[in-house]
Amino acid sequence: MATFSQKPAEVEKKWVIIDAEGLVVGRLASIIAMRLRGKHKATFTPHVDDGDNVIVINADKVVFTGKKYSDKVYYWHTGFAGGIKERTARQIIEGRFPERVLEKAVERMVPRGPLGRRQMKNLRVYAGSNHPHEAQQPVALDVAVLNKKNVRSA
């Protein structure tokens, strides 16, 4: 019996919505990355984009464990000499685009390459509770129920 390999035309993508309020960033990002890649499906094929479309709401209400909220530092470089920049998780979450913390966490858990970039386009993260994807009829995924460590009460 030959190993099953799914073809791109056979892929069935579902829409999933996750409420990120009170959820731990890394644990949530891990679940989202698995959904984006399609590893939760029995038909998973490493070279095919067979993951689901994931919508995340309330991304500004995610939590960190320990002192990561104030101590975790995100670095980037401007390209100019001495152009290293940094921001803490607290500064980003309290800033203009708090959803970027979760986007960056998921991005770092997805393979870096053409397929990973295509899979990241199936992720939509919103800071508030409103999203423009009601027409897709997304199915709610309750991450808090999967494991009690996924939720952190402040």
From Swiss-Prot:
Q: Name one GO biological process term.
A: translation
Protein's UniProt keywords contain Transport: no
One GO cellular component term of this record is:
cytosolic large ribosomal subunit
Q: Which GO terms describe its molecular function?
A: mRNA binding; structural constituent of ribosome
Q: Does the keyword Ribosomal protein apply?
A: yes
**Keywords for this entry?**
Ribonucleoprotein, Ribosomal protein
Task: List the Pfam families.
Answer: Ribosomal_L13 (PF00572)
Origin superkingdom: Bacteria
The record's listing under HAMAP family reads: Ribosomal_uL13 (MF_01366)
- What's this chain's function? This protein is one of the early assembly proteins of the 50S ribosomal subunit, although it is not seen to bind rRNA by itself. It is important during the early stages of 50S assembly.
Q: Which family does it belong to?
A: Belongs to the universal ribosomal protein uL13 family.
Q: How does it assemble?
A: Part of the 50S ribosomal subunit.
Q: What is this protein called?
A: Large ribosomal subunit protein uL13
Tell me the organism. Answer: Rhizobium leguminosarum bv. trifolii (strain WSM2304)
Read off the lineage from the record: Bacteria, Pseudomonadati, Pseudomonadota, Alphaproteobacteria, Hyphomicrobiales
